Amino acid sequence: MAKGKDVRVTIILECTNCVRNDIKKESPGISRYITQKNRHNTPSRLELRKFCPYCYKHTIHGEIKK
């Protein structure tokens, strides 16, 4: 009896600073976090400040598509 769409979905947060620097090939990698969000409470894309081990600072991590 599973519903068609679950309320909680798994999302991936990616560092926006590393993505911009990846074009110039300055960054050794791209930081990604896996988390969950409630689709009813947060219908828009999620953005959180998380620590990026490649930038060595707290940056904005935005939700990406799978």
Curated annotation (Swiss-Prot):
**Pfam families attached to this UniProt entry:** Ribosomal_L33
Q: Name one GO cellular component term.
A: ribosome
Compartments where located: Plastid, Chloroplast
A single GO molecular-function term is: structural constituent of ribosome
Keywords of the record: Chloroplast, Plastid, Ribonucleoprotein, Ribosomal protein
* UniProt-listed SUPFAM superfamilies: Zn-binding ribosomal proteins
Instruction: Name the domain of life.
Output: Eukaryota
GO terms for biological process? translation
* Similarity-based family: Belongs to the bacterial ribosomal protein bL33 family.
Listed NCBIfam families: PRK00504.1, PRK00595.1, rpmG_bact
What name appears for this protein in its UniProt entry? Large ribosomal subunit protein bL33c
**Source organism of the structure:** Aethionema grandiflorum
Q: Which gene encodes it?
A: rpl33
